[in-house]
């Protein structure tokens, strides 16, 4: 299809034109996201960010190009959350569209998962990092979650704990917006943003989803079983599977 044949998509009602208006939109989006994250716990002052933007090396592009993650501390757990997937998009005509990919993603784990204090070097940060890049690469994960209630992924983590990888040396995650400890959405001046929580799966749980005739139903049943388990929707490596193939 030539450029002349690509249908024109009209800007949304919240779109703005020009660099200054776009900068204000970005500042408003960041302020709304920061306020939401602060409502979840104590936010570390420093963000986690790569020295070189992955999009410069062939990785997926985030809406405002900036890629970062926040660490949010609770009394008994730590949340690692993406910080930028819901930034405004800018097109070649300096038109800024708010809310980016319409989502942010996070993982919550017990304090014991970070006993050495190296959050940026942890397998849980690797999980959130890879999930964030998958979301940016796909572009419409919000539509999948709205349609099916949840999605699952198999990720190639660099150094996961023993016993988490399946026969393909991948680690499964369940992704949805129903975690009882994290709100499903947060508000911005331009509309809501979906907050997706990833829960790491045991290999048997990932296999159960893959073998189910109704995978959406299997994911929903797994989400309910996880929520009712002692660890809830926290990502815990050494727990028993709550559902089997």
What are the functions of these language-model segments?
Residues 1-245:
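Short linear motifs embedded in intrinsically disordered, proline/glycine-rich low-complexity segments
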């Amino acid at each position: 299809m030539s450029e002349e044949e690509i249908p024109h998509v009209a800007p949304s009602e919240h779109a703005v034109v020009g660099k200054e208006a776009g900068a204000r939109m970005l500042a408003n989006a960041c302020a709304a996201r920061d306020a939401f994250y602060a409502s979840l716990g104590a936010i570390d002052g420093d963000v986690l960010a790569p020295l070189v933007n992955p999009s410069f090396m062939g990785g997926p592009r985030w809406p405002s190009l900036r890629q970062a993650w926040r660490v949010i501390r609770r009394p008994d757990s730590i949340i690692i959350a993406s910080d930028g997937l819901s930034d405004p998009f800018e097109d070649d005509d300096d038109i800024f569209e708010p809310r980016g990919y319409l989502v942010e993603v996070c993982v919550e784990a017990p304090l014991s998962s970070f006993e050495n204090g190296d959050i940026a070097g942890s397998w849980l940060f690797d999980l959130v990092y890879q999930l964030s890049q998958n979301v940016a690469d796909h572009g419409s994960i919000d539509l999948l979650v709205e349609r099916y209630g949840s999605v699952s992924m198999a990720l190639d983590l660099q150094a996961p704990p023993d016993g988490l990888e399946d026969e393909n040396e991948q680690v499964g995650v369940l992704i949805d917006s129903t975690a009882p400890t994290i709100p499903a959405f947060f508000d911005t001046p331009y509309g809501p943003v979906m907050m997706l929580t990833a829960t790491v799966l045991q290999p048997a749980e990932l296999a159960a989803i893959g073998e189910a005739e109704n995978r959406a139903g299997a994911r929903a049943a797994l989400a309910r079983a996880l929520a009712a388990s002692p660890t809830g929707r926290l990502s815990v490596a050494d727990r028993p599977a709550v559902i089997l193939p």
